[in-house]
Amino acid sequence: MLVSLSWLKEFVDIDEDAKTIAEGLTMSGSKVEGIKSYGEEISNVVVGQIVSLEKHPNADKLWVGIVDIGSEKLQIVTGAENIKVGAYIPVALHGATLPGGVKIKRSKLRGVESEGMMCSAEELGLDESLLPEYQRNGIFILPPLPLGMDINEALQLKDDVLEFEITPNRPDCLSVVGIARETAATFRKSFRMPEIRVTEVEEPNPARVTIEAPDLCYRYVARVVKNVKIGPSPIWMQVRLLKAGIRPINNVVDVTNYVMLELGQPLHAFDLDKVKNKHIIVRRARDGEKLVTLDGKERILDSSMLVIADEEKAIGLAGVMGGENTEITDSTVNILIESANFKGSNIRHTSKKLGLRSEASARFEKGLDPEITVLACERAAQLMEKYCGGEVLKGIVDEYPKPMERTVLTVRPDRINKFLGTNLATSEMIEILRSLEFEVVEKGEELEIKVPHFRKDVTMEADIAEEIARLYGYNNIEDSLMKNAQTTLGSLTKEQQLEEKAREVLLACGLNEIVTMSFMGERDLDRINVPKDSVLRKAVKIINPLGEEQSLMRTTLLPFMLNVAYTNYSRKVGEFRAFEISRVFLPKELPLKELPEEVKTISLGMYGKEVDFYTIKGVIEELLEVMGIVDVEYVRAEEPSYHPGRSAKILFKEEVLGVFGEVHPDVLENYDLPVRVYAGELNLDKIIKFANVDKKYTPLPKYPAVERDIAVVVDKDLFVAEVEKVIKETGRGFVEKTALFDVYKGPNIPEGKKSVAFSIWYRSYEKTLTDEEVNEVHARIVKALEEKLGAKLR
């Protein structure tokens, strides 16, 4: 954001120089990245008028001009092709200096004396690329101005321009008024808005506005100005636009851009005579609808986009760019000024989808204040009346379906001081907040604060503390020791150590760690088959999202793992094994009244020739074993994201530690993954809660173990864990451990059945077991499997 210091000083009385202002604003949170000075190095350059122009006698590409500078007439030789007799131009006299230390002297060019130099815009320090075609690569053509007037005075050129880095949460600072408000608060000066007075004629405003998409258009204001005369805008306005990096076009368009820079509200001007029945309709685009935008390109739209239309056609892409079919041209007589407020995330989505960004979309997508729309419209009407010769028709159309309510917060000054480590008086806090246009009322030991409409980023007590801190000055807050706070020196907490141990186990199992963003969209949940009434749908919404696909804080890691799996598969990676340790955000209630629960979660994902259900189960078992969590139970999972017969929940002490299994084929189809993918999500917080990593000495067994194999035929849908559970329960006191070594379906196995084979180790810690004792226990296990699970010994 480029802000002219002379423009800034119209709204705040401040005498400090640019450097002091830049330092103060940077310290209060409005970071200044650079300062560019205009006119400082320019001297002895005046306004002149060409009174005659002849070909150079000795050069085909040079001209000899006589230029009147008021006090005298000078002969100047030039090679410019864009000049003519009668043109007003900047003239650098003998002894003049220009930006970059260039000095001008009398000289002879091919035998003809030149007593000065005609100047281009670039030679005056302006960006020539922003000028109209006829002004580029030639002399800067001026409007009629007093001859001999100093060019700095004529163009209001002498100025400093501050370049600000504006963060996305402060769209109110994308304006001169916004920066002026911050300047006034920072330097304890008075702030004033521009004076706006509109003189209306008796003729009523004929425009009508219908908002058909109130979820995307929060407010739409329209004014009509008739009998405008299209021409160049005042030179001072053009120069201000150039300093701000905006191309001057004509007086009407320049006024809309000027007001956008001044107040932060994008405007658009339609040729009213091209709007069918003077009826503006704000609606969603139709799928396949076409619109040629002002850049001359045809855009194919869809129903996710918002358009401004009349009764026949789309005439503008809401918040992004107007349509060519209602463009302001030299023949335009009557105009309609649009000042509207649109949903920021929708504007960002449209802009990104069409690959079309503009100064307007850059502001709208951050979320603007709907309360500024009328003021901006009136300001534009005022300037058009003055500089376009227009007549403002009576009445303003203002469609505002659901007026915005101001946020009201209750804060306690003592908590603010505790939070900041300061000892500020309540009166000082109130003074700071009021300088930022917060309304503050003392109520006992509390402050009731009404947040200004333009400060959507202030939603809680911590935000108020930040406002006070930055205006008080972070550099003024004295260092202090923390009181009553637990600290750890030189080591990780138990939770951090266990998280690191989990990471080491997963890396040792051959998985690669990934890191993904914490934001998701509704589409991510749709793609993994999350039901509409699922708790996972109750996600925290981002106030100023980067787009619809990043509008929520994520409640699951699965979509991100599948995205990474797809990226690897699409790049011909044949074997994929990965994990992520991150947080999911689960709100306790919506709308949000307190911070959501942040659950640390492990996400697993893998595919490949050697990968199956038991591969991912083995990784999980290894992790739990290292964490000292034994005797977990695996039960069938009924999760819509997973294959119903090839997924499981992990239970320990009646709590769910996680879910894993083969990803549902429908979900894989949504991600264009033609291979089987196995995934899982584990609650790391619960794993850490139950972890028991204290090492205990266990003597080596004195007596030998006896190993026996058992293979049984069971229903194909029966979980192997259920077979293992029966074996261990029946053989308690004798069965030391079990290991699955085969699952078989095929010839010699009945339809709907499968063969499951285990190795069983029998051991007593009191004596050596005899064959008879082992046979007896083994037989009991076979019988229990038959009775409880319907198993048949192979």
UniProtKB/Swiss-Prot annotation:
Domain FDX-ACB, first and last residues per copy: 701-794
Any single biological process term in GO: phenylalanyl-tRNA aminoacylation
Cofactors demanded by this protein: Mg(2+)
Location(s) in or outside the cell: Cytoplasm
Broad enzyme group: ligase
EC numbers: 6.1.1.20
Residue ranges annotated for the tRNA-binding domain, each copy included: 39-152
Domain B5: 404-479
GO cellular component: phenylalanine-tRNA ligase complex
Major subcellular site: cytoplasm
Signal peptide (from-to): none
Catalytic activity, reaction form: tRNA(Phe) + L-phenylalanine + ATP = L-phenylalanyl-tRNA(Phe) + AMP + diphosphate + H(+)
Bound cofactor: record note: Binds 2 magnesium ions per tetramer.
Chain sites annotated for binding Mg(2+): D457, D463, E466, E467
GO molecular function per UniProt: ATP binding; catalytic activity, acting on a protein; magnesium ion binding; phenylalanine-tRNA ligase activity; transferase activity; tRNA binding
UniProt keywords, alphabetically: Aminoacyl-tRNA synthetase, ATP-binding, Cytoplasm, Ligase, Magnesium, Metal-binding, Nucleotide-binding, Protein biosynthesis, RNA-binding, tRNA-binding
Gene3D superfamilies, per database record: 3.30.56.10, Bira Bifunctional Protein, Domain 2 (3.30.930.10), Ferrodoxin-fold anticodon-binding domain (3.30.70.380), Nucleic acid-binding proteins (2.40.50.140), Phenylalanyl-trna Synthetase, Chain B, domain 3 (3.50.40.10)
Pfam families from the UniProt entry: B3_4, B5, FDX-ACB, tRNA_bind, tRNA_synthFbeta
Complex formation: Tetramer of two alpha and two beta subunits.
Family statement: Belongs to the phenylalanyl-tRNA synthetase beta subunit family. Type 1 subfamily.
Protein name, entry field: Phenylalanine--tRNA ligase beta subunit
Upper lineage: Bacteria, Bacillati, Bacillota, Clostridia, Thermoanaerobacterales
